C-alpha cells in the first residue's frame, strides 16, 4: 500500500497544477485521483494481469486527450503540464513491459504511443530493449526501421535494422518487402524534391537505436550474414539525386538479394515485389529515361518469374492478368487477345487440367466486367473457352472433372447437341465415373426428344438409351467399388442406384421392381443403406403406394444380415404399419417377427415398451 500512496501523492501534485490552470475543477481532480487509486491497487497487486495495465493506460490516454482539448480552448495547448497524463501512461507502459518483457503486442503499443504522441527522446533506447527481448519479432524490426527512417530521418540506420531483422527472421517475407518499399519510398522523396533531412551518420548519435548485434546473434544462435553494403555516394541525398541509382538500382539490389535467400523460390513472395513497384512507376522518369524506377523493377521481376517458374500455373495467370489490367491499352478486345495468347502459351507448356481450370476461371472473370451490349466481346470469350477445351481434349489433358465442366459450359451456351455428344465420349473414356454417368443420364432424361432424333440417326445407340445407361453405370461403377473399398466410392454407387430407383418410380408406369431390385442385390454390397433410402423416398412421395413400400421392407428384411442385426429397420417397418397404414394387427405381427429374427431382441423390446 505504501507504493500506491507514494504514486498517488506524485500524481496528485501534477494534477493539482491542472486545477490551478483551470483545466479541471477540484471535484474532477478528486474523481480522477479516486479512479487512479483504484487502478494503482490493481497493478501493484501480486497477481496483476496485462489487462490491468492496459485498462489503466487507456484511462490515462483519455485524460490526456481531455486535458489537451481543454488546453487548446484556453490557448495553452503546448503547456508541458497538460501532458502529465501522457507521461504517466508512458511510465505505466514501462512497468508493464518490465513485468511482461516477451509480450510483442505490449511493446508495439508502447512504442507506437511514444512515436505518435510523445517526443522521440528515449524512444531509441526503448526500441533497443524491446528488440533485445524479442529479436524474433518481425513487426518490431519493421517498426524500429520505420522510426529511424521516418522520425530520425536516418536511412542508413534503417537499412541496418531491417537487415538485422532479416537475419533473425529468415523465413519472414514481410521484412524483405518492407526493405524494398523503404528504398523506393526514399528515392521517391528525393525525386519529388521533398526536404528529407539527411543527418550525418555518427556512431554516437543520441536517439539512434543501438544494439549489440553480435551478442544478440550469439544468444539466439544466429549465423552472421554480411549486410548489403552501399557506397558513400548514396549516403548523401544530394549525390543520390543526381545519380542513376535514383531509378531504382538500390531496390534492385534488395530484390536480387531477396530471391537468393531461403524463401526466394516462393512465387507469391516475388509477386508482391511487383505490386510494391507499381506504386513507383514514374520515379526517375524523364526525357532521357522513358522508363521509371518502378517499371524497370517490374520488368526484372517478371523476367525472374518466367525464368524460375516456367511450369507454374501462377506465372501465366499472373502475366495474363497484367495484360488485362493495362490502362495503356484502351481496347478491351485487344487486352483480351493479348491475355489469351499468354494463357495458350501456358497451356501448351504445362498441359494439366488444373492449369486449364485456372485458365477458364480467369476468362470467366472477365465476363463480369463486360457490358451486356458488347456482344462481339462475349462471342470472342465464348470462342476462347471452347478452343481451350478442344485443345485439352485433343491433347488428353481433360480428366473426369474437366469433361463435367465442359459439358456444363456447352449446356450454358445452349449447345445441347454438342453436350450430348461430349457426354457420350466422356463415359466411354471414364467408364467408372459416377459423376459422368449421372450427368449423362440427366441429360438424356431432360432432352428426350433430342435423344430420340440422335437414336434414329445412330442406329439405336445404347448410350442414348436411359435404361441401358443406368445398367452400364451400375455395372461399371460397382466393379470399380469392389477394388476401391472407400466409403466415398460405396456411397457414390449407392446414390447412383437411388437415382435409378427414382427414375423407375417416376417414369416407368409398370413399376417393375423385380428387375431393378435383382440388379441391386447382385451388384450392391450395402443393401441396408440402399433400401432405407428407397423406403424414405417412397414414404415422402405425395402419391405413395403402401404396397410398394411394404414390398421394399420385405425385400430388405429377406436379407439375413439385415433381419438378424438391424433393429431400426424392424422398428421403422412396425411404425410404418402403425402410423401410415393404420394396420395395428400387421404392426404387431412385424414386431413379433422382429423379436424372433433379431440375434439380440432386447433393444427392440425396449423401444416397443
Curated annotation (Swiss-Prot):
One annotated Gene Ontology cellular component of this protein: Pwp2p-containing subcomplex of 90S preribosome
Report whether Kinase shows up as a keyword of the record.
no
Q: Which InterPro entries match?
A: HAT, TPR-like_helical_dom_sf, Utp6, UTP6_C, UTP6_N
Question: What Pfam family is a match, any one?
Answer: UTP6_C
Per the UniProt entry, what are the Gene Ontology biological process annotations, in alphabetical order? maturation of SSU-rRNA; maturation of SSU-rRNA from tricistronic rRNA transcript (SSU-rRNA, 5.8S rRNA, LSU-rRNA)
HAT repeat segments: 84-116, 118-150, 511-540, 544-579
Which SMART domains is this protein grouped with?
Answer: HAT
Q: Where in or outside the cell?
A: Nucleus, Nucleolus
Primary location group: nucleus
Q: Which UniProt keywords apply?
A: Nucleus, Repeat, rRNA processing
Molecular function (Gene Ontology), one example = snoRNA binding
Q: Does the keyword Magnesium apply?
A: no
Q: What family does the Swiss-Prot or TrEMBL record give for this protein?
A: Belongs to the UTP6 family.
**What does the UniProt record say this protein does?**
Involved in nucleolar processing of pre-18S ribosomal RNA.
Q: What is this protein called?
A: U3 small nucleolar RNA-associated protein 6 homolog
